[in-house]
Amino acid sequence: MEIKLFGKWDSETVTVKDPSLKSYVSVTPVLVPHTAGRNSKKSFDKSKMNIVERLANKLMANQNNTGKKHETLAIVEEALTIIENRTKENPVQVLVDALENSGPREETTRISYGGIAFLQSVDVSPSRRLDTAFRNIALGASQSAHKNKKTVAQCLADEIIFASKADMQKSFAVRKKEEKERVAQSAR
C-alpha cells in the first residue's frame, strides 16, 4: 500500500528543479503531516519535515490560529484540493514550484565599518530561502483573506497558484522576493 498525503496526493512523483533546494525540500510520503515537534530539537532537522507541515506551521504563526494545528491542516488540505481542481496537476508539485519561485536568492545585510553603516548584498542560504518563501506565502494568504469574503483556504490556493506561475502582479510572495532582490542589486 502506498502512502499518499491526506490519502489523496502522491508525493513520490514530485521533483525539485532547483538544485540548491533539493536537500531542503522534503516531500517524504506521510499520511498526515504532523510530527509534533520531533524535528525542532536540532538546527537543520526542519529540512527533514514535510513541506506541507512547514506551511501549516507558518499559517499557525498568525495570532488567531496559534496552536490550532488541526484547523490549520484542514485549511491546507482544502487549499490543496482547490489547487488540484483548478490546475489539474499534483498540488504538492505546484507548492514546490511556488516555493522555488518565491524564495529570494539574494538579500542585504547591514555592515557598520568605522561608525558608518551601509547595506551589503549577500547570497541567501537554501534554508533561509525556504523559510522566507513559507513566511511570505502564509502572510500573503492571511492578508488577502482579511476583511474578504474568500476563505483562508481559497486565498492560500490563489497565492500558491500565482507563486508557482511566478506572477508578480498577483502573488504577494513573488512581489516580496523581487523587492528584496532589487534592493540587494542596488546595494552591490
UniProtKB/Swiss-Prot annotation:
GO terms for cellular component: small ribosomal subunit. SUPFAM superfamilies: Ribosomal protein S7 (SSF47973). The keyword DNA-binding does not apply. Belongs to the universal ribosomal protein uS7 family. One of the primary rRNA binding proteins, it binds directly to 16S rRNA where it nucleates assembly of the head domain of the 30S subunit. Is located at the subunit interface close to the decoding center. PANTHER family: RIBOSOMAL PROTEIN S7 (PTHR11205). It comes from the Archaea. This is Small ribosomal subunit protein uS7. Part of the 30S ribosomal subunit. GO terms for molecular function: rRNA binding; structural constituent of ribosome. Keywords: Ribonucleoprotein, Ribosomal protein, RNA-binding, rRNA-binding. Gene3D superfamilies: Ribosomal protein S7 domain. InterPro entries: Ribosomal_uS7, Ribosomal_uS7_arc, Ribosomal_uS7_CS, Ribosomal_uS7_dom, Ribosomal_uS7_dom_sf, Ribosomal_uS7_euk/arc. GO terms for biological process: translation. It comes from Methanococcus maripaludis (strain C6 / ATCC BAA-1332).
